[in-house]
């Protein structure tokens, strides 16, 4: 994790000139609109679980209150937007380790990348692990040695990333349940289903207090 913190800071500290990357204007509004649309597919489903729907609605309501009317990117940098453990090629040391897969890179805030990488909805997908608060703090402390960040913005991005993970899985669960011709292996379907199990939703709800 120390190497990952260093690599992320190195990417975020990389100078950039004129480019064709999208500049994220109001990322929270964009993320909310996307999540609301995905959630709508599950919530409108006649086979939707009432308790699951209740969690999703609560998460949406909380995030709605967190969307700023006006928002400006404080310290813009190149961000990956889809970071998970699979994006890191770790060598013997930090100097021969790399971050890969940059299909959806944009100009945004480092806090968005940090939150996506550390969110429970990200770590659980690849590793079945949900990081403890102490582990998140330790990672951020290491990152802060190389680049400063705004903790409040990080926390807000963290909540929105949790919403995105849950709503995407709820949408995918309905789609694959209704169409047995869609290609998906059993392991992936079970993982998607686990995101809308009450035990997982209760753990994630801790971020929406």
Predicted regions, residues:
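All-alpha amphipathic helical-bundle segments outside canonical DNA-binding/catalytic cores
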Residues: 23-26, 148-161
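ATP/Mg2+ or Mg2+-diphosphate-binding catalytic cores
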Residues: 167-209
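Hydrophobic core segments within long, regular secondary-structure runs in both alpha-
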Residues: 57-61, 133-140, 189-201
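Active-site acidic catalytic loop and adjacent metal/ATP-binding pocket
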Residues: 11, 64-112
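Short proline/glycine- and basic residue-enriched helix-capping loop/turn segments at helix->loop/beta transitions
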Residues: 30, 58-65
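A cross-family kinase active-site recognition segment
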Residues: 1-55, 74-76, 106-107, 186-187
């Amino acid at each position: 994790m120390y190497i990952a913190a260093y690599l992320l800071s190195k990417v975020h500290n990389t100078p950039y000139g004129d480019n064709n990357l999208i500049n994220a204007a109001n990322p929270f509004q964009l993320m909310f609109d996307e999540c609301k649309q995905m959630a709508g597919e599950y919530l409108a489903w006649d086979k939707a679980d009432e308790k699951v729907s209740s969690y999703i609605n609560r998460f949406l309501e909380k995030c709605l209150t967190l969307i700023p009317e006006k928002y400006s990117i404080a310290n813009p940098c190149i961000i990956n937007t889809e970071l998970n453990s699979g994006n890191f090629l770790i060598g013997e040391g930090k100097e021969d380790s790399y971050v890969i897969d940059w299909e959806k890179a944009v100009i945004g805030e480092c806090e968005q990348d940090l939150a996506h990488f550390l969110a429970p909805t990200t770590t659980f997908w690849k590793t079945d692990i949900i990081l403890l608060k102490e582990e998140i703090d330790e990672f951020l402390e290491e990152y802060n040695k190389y680049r400063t960040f705004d903790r409040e913005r990080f926390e807000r991005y963290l909540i929105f990333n949790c919403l995105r993970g849950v709503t995407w899985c709820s949408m995918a669960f309905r789609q694959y349940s209704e169409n047995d011709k869609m290609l998906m292996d059993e392991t992936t379907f079970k993982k998607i289903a686990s995101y809308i199990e009450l035990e997982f939703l209760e753990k994630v709800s801790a971020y929406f207090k």
